[in-house]
C-alpha cells in the first residue's frame, strides 16, 4: 500500500511541477502582415472618442523596441490567464523594451470590457477596442464575417514589421514578449 501511495504521489508531483510545460503556440504570419502592419484606425477603450491608429502604434515604438498587441475578449478564459501574466510582469516587460497594447475583439459593451480589465488590474494599460473586427480582418487574422480564435498576440518591431504571431500563451510567453 505504501508503494502504491508513493507511486501515486510521485506521479502527481511529476505532472504538476511543469515537467511537461507547454511552449507558446507560434503561428505562421498571414500574408496581410508579413511585411508590415497595414494602416488601421480603432478606438481607445478609456474613451470611445479617442482614435488609435497605426501612427499611435508607431509613436509607441519611439519609446520601446517592440510592441505586443495582445488580443482578448471577456469570455476567453485563456485570454484572462495571459493578461494576468502580463500584468504581473508588466514592469519587467517594459524594462526589456516591449510596450503592451491590449486589443479587445468583437465586443460592443465597452463598460463590460473596462470592468473586466479593472478586475485584472489591467485598466491602466493601453487598451483599444475592435468591436466590428475590422482590425483583425485587415491584418488577415480572420476572413470577413468569421470569428477570431483567441488568444492571439502580434509582436512588432520599431518599423512595425511583425516579428511573431502567437496563439495560446505558454510558459515562455513572457520571455517571448521580452524579446528573449
Give short role names for the model-derived ranges.
Residues 80-121, 134-138:
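Structural microenvironment flanking redox-active thiols in thiol-disulfide oxidoreductases
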Residues 149-180:
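Thiol-/selenol-based redox modules, centered on thioredoxin-like
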Residues 117-150:
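Short, internal strand/loop/helix patches
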Residues 18-48:
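N-proximal helix/coil linker or "cap" segments that precede and/or mark the start of modular domains
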Residues 41-67:
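A short beta-strand-turn-helix
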Residues 7-16:
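Bacterial N-terminal signal peptides
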Residues 70-76:
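Aromatic-flanked redox-active Cys/Sec active sites in thiol-based oxidoreductases
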Residues 1-4:
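Positively charged n-region of N-terminal signal peptides that target proteins for export
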Amino acid at each position: 500500500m505504501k508503494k502504491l501511495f508513493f507511486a501515486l504521489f510521485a506521479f502527481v508531483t511529476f505532472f504538476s511541477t511543469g515537467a511537461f510545460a507547454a511552449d507558446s503556440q507560434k503561428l505562421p504570419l498571414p500574408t496581410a502582415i508579413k511585411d508590415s502592419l497595414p494602416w488601421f484606425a480603432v478606438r481607445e477603450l478609456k474613451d470611445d472618442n479617442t482614435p488609435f491608429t497605426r501612427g499611435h502604434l508607431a509613436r509607441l515604438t519611439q519609446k520601446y523596441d517592440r510592441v505586443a498587441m495582445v488580443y482578448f475578449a471577456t469570455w476567453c478564459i485563456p485570454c484572462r490567464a495571459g493578461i494576468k501574466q502580463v500584468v504581473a510582469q508588466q514592469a519587467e516587460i517594459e524594462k526589456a523594451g516591449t510596450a503592451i497594447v491590449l486589443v479587445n475583439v468583437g465586443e460592443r459593451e465597452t463598460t463590460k470590457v473596462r470592468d473586466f480589465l479593472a478586475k485584472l488590474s489591467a485598466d491602466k494599460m493601453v487598451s483599444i477596442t475592435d468591436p466590428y473586427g475590422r482590425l483583425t480582418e485587415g491584418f488577415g487574422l480572420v476572413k470577413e464575417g468569421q470569428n477570431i480564435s483567441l488568444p492571439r498576440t502580434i509582436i512588432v518591431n520599431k518599423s512595425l514589421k511583425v516579428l511573431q504571431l502567437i496563439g495560446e500563451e505558454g510558459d515562455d510567453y513572457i520571455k517571448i514578449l521580452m524579446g528573449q
